[in-house]
């Protein structure tokens, strides 16, 4: 993809372009003339997020089937460490009673981590294969650098927040929480509704945009290094940034998991 006939601007733009499908015609969108329409699906982001989700399920299912009470192997030990870490985080932060929270937190952490991990692949590897083997006009391989994916995950968390709020407090209790806090007087209902409504809606928005912003920035830095520097000097910056980026992708997965647990814990508290 870093072909000689590409300017740095073309190279950067190409790697920031998704493989899209027009849902009205079920045809691939020309990346040089993308339609400004709601009915467009980023099929590369969807594909990689689903594949990584299935990979997560396959790995954990394989370990569960082969789990032994004897001396565990290295892979089983790593999986057990992750499960223990997530279980400890849930135990410390979620004080309600729900069998869903720990599996949800584990899924969120590992799934987001795997999506973030795609950012460490060589920039041109999968796009080159996509173009020269499958004839794809564009391909982005980091699902968490797509705002549609991160906001969709955040929307799922938001639905659970509403579910647990209504389950624990009832419809009337949830409505009272929105209308009688922080000012417990009927005259302040409009003010309370605005304040609590903004606070409630800001949770999924900030959750999704935080992950997207950090991963998009990381992806962009890799692309800038590959697109603007000579090939022989790219490793000088790529290797240190990749090592530092390992911390970033792990931290972002952890933050997404922690905020999910905290938001659901707040929703489960009875006032």
From Swiss-Prot:
One of its GO terms (biological process) is proton motive force-driven plasma membrane ATP synthesis. InterPro entries: ATP_syn_F0_a_bact/chloroplast (IPR045082), ATP_synth_F0_asu (IPR000568), ATP_synth_F0_asu_AS (IPR023011), F0_ATP_A_sf (IPR035908). GO terms for cellular component: plasma membrane; proton-transporting ATP synthase complex. The chain crosses the membrane at residues 38-58, 100-120, 146-166, 220-240, 242-262. SUPFAM superfamilies: F1F0 ATP synthase subunit A. GO terms for molecular function: proton-transporting ATP synthase activity, rotational mechanism. Gene3D superfamilies: ATP synthase, F0 complex, subunit A. It is found in: Cell inner membrane. It is a multi-pass membrane protein. Pfam families: ATP-synt_A. Keywords: ATP synthesis, Cell inner membrane, Cell membrane, CF(0), Hydrogen ion transport, Ion transport, Membrane, Transmembrane, Transmembrane helix, Transport. Key component of the proton channel; it plays a direct role in the translocation of protons across the membrane. F-type ATPases have 2 components, CF(1) - the catalytic core - and CF(0) - the membrane proton channel. CF(1) has five subunits: alpha(3), beta(3), gamma(1), delta(1), epsilon(1). CF(0) has three main subunits: a(1), b(2) and c(9-12). The alpha and beta chains form an alternating ring which encloses part of the gamma chain. CF(1) is attached to CF(0) by a central stalk formed by the gamma and epsilon chains, while a peripheral stalk is formed by the delta and b chains. PANTHER family: ATP SYNTHASE SUBUNIT A, CHLOROPLASTIC (PTHR42823:SF3). Belongs to the ATPase A chain family. This is ATP synthase subunit a. It comes from Enterobacter sp. (strain 638). The gene is atpB.
């Amino acid at each position: 993809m870093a072909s000689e006939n590409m300017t740095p601007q073309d190279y950067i733009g190409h790697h920031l372009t998704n493989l899209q499908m027009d849902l009205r015609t079920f045809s691939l969108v020309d990346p040089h003339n993308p339609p400004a329409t709601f009915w467009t699906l980023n099929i590369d982001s969807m594909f990689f997020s689903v594949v990584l989700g299935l990979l997560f399920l396959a790995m954990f299912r394989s370990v569960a089937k082969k789990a032994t009470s004897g001396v565990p192997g290295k892979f089983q030990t790593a999986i057990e460490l992750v499960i223990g870490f997530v279980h400890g985080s849930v135990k410390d932060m979620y004080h309600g009673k729900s069998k869903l929270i720990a599996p949800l937190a584990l899924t969120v952490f590992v799934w987001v981590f795997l999506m973030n991990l795609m950012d460490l692949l060589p920039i041109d590897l999968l796009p080159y294969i996509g173009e020269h083997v499958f004839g794809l006009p564009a391909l982005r391989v980091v699902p968490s650098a797509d705002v549609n994916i991160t906001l969709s995950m955040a929307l799922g968390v938001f639905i659970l927040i509403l579910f647990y709020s209504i389950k624990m407090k009832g419809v009337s209790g949830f409505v009272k929480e929105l209308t009688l806090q922080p000012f417990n007087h009927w005259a302040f209902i409009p003010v309370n509704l605005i304040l609590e409504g903004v606070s409630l809606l800001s949770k999924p928005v900030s959750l999704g945009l935080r992950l997207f912003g950090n991963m998009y920035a990381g992806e962009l830095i890799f692309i800038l290094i590959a697109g603007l520097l000579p090939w022989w000097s790219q490793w000088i910056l790529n290797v240190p940034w990749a090592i530092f980026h390992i911390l970033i992708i792990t931290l972002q997965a952890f933050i997404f998991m922690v905020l999910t647990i905290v938001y659901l814990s707040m929703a489960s508290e009875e006032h």
